[in-house]
């Protein structure tokens, strides 16, 4: 099986959400799926809004990144999450 690297963009529900807490929640969620977090960064947008990008590495499997993406979307502090880049290594 191949290794998959994905870049997932998560948008918080409001600018008041603590960035560091959100980043830690996303890292923990990724690790629950047996994947490795290869980096997390936040990118400012406007008016205090920001997006969080998380790099995820895992073995290729049926369903791909969908289960992780769905779990991120289910978090209370996440408005939306989507895979923006995907590559096989």
Curated annotation (Swiss-Prot):
Pfam families: EF1_GNE. It comes from the Archaea. Disulfide bonds: none annotated. GO terms for molecular function: translation elongation factor activity. Keywords: Elongation factor, Protein biosynthesis. Promotes the exchange of GDP for GTP in EF-1-alpha/GDP, thus allowing the regeneration of EF-1-alpha/GTP that could then be used to form the ternary complex EF-1-alpha/GTP/AAtRNA. HAMAP family: EF1_beta. PANTHER family: ELONGATION FACTOR 1-BETA. Belongs to the EF-1-beta/EF-1-delta family. This is Elongation factor 1-beta. It comes from Methanococcus vannielii (strain ATCC 35089 / DSM 1224 / JCM 13029 / OCM 148 / SB).
């Amino acid at each position: 099986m191949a290794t998959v690297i994905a870049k997932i963009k998560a948008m918080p529900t409001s600018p008041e959400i603590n960035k560091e807490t959100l980043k830690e929640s996303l890292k923990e969620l990724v690790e629950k799926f047996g994947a490795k977090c290869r980096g997390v960064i936040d990118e400012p947008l406007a008016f205090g809004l920001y997006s969080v990008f998380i790099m995820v590495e895992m073995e290729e499997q049926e369903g791909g990144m969908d289960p992780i993406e769905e779990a991120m979307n289910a978090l209370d502090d996440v408005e939306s999450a989507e895979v923006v880049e995907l590559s096989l290594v």
